[in-house]
Amino acid sequence: EVKIMHLGPGHTKGDTVVWVPSEKVLFSGDLMEADAACYTGDAQLEEWPATLDALAALKPEKIVPGRGPALDTPESVASGFAYTRDFVSTLLSSAKEAVAMKLNLKQAMAHCRTKMDPKFGHVFIYEHCLPFDVTRAVDEASGIKHPRIWTAERDKEMWHGLQAAD
């Protein structure tokens, strides 16, 4: 038996996982990462931890994450959950701080880096994902619940904001 399920939003609003109950194997897609940055440009950051709880409730023994090595021991499964939760929580909490301080996007990026870089700066695709991650986290922390669609104009707006003068 193979189950295709939506257990809640996280990486996107409509994340789907594949669960093989007889083998206790979970294909999590980008809801979980291992040794790689989480791409959160289209995420529901506030809701993501509850979705991780729903995944954990399945009690998977092996997880195939969206990026990174397969998690095939109890320790690596626990570590994958902790890592993803920490990435998402650190990102959102630092963005909330930046919004509370009324920082512009460039300043918010610098602030988020002070929290994110020491923990995650070494992982795969971190530098690629971070501008999109911080932009979405600042949006969500500012009250924009649903991600804005990434258009060419929005992409330009983001890069302009990140390069703007302080």
Region spans (language model):
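C-terminal regulatory/interaction regions
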Residues: 100-166
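Divalent-metal (often Zn2+) His-rich catalytic cores of metallo-beta-lactamase-fold enzymes
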Residues: 47-107, 111
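Acidic, low-complexity intrinsically disordered regions
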Residues: 44, 79-82, 146, 155
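Alpha-helix capping and helix-loop boundary segments enriched in small/acidic/polar residues
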Residues: 39, 79-83, 125
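Catalytic core of the metallo-beta-lactamase
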Residues: 1-50, 57
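Short, well-ordered beta-strand elements within core beta-sheets of diverse protein domains
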Residues: 36-40, 97, 138
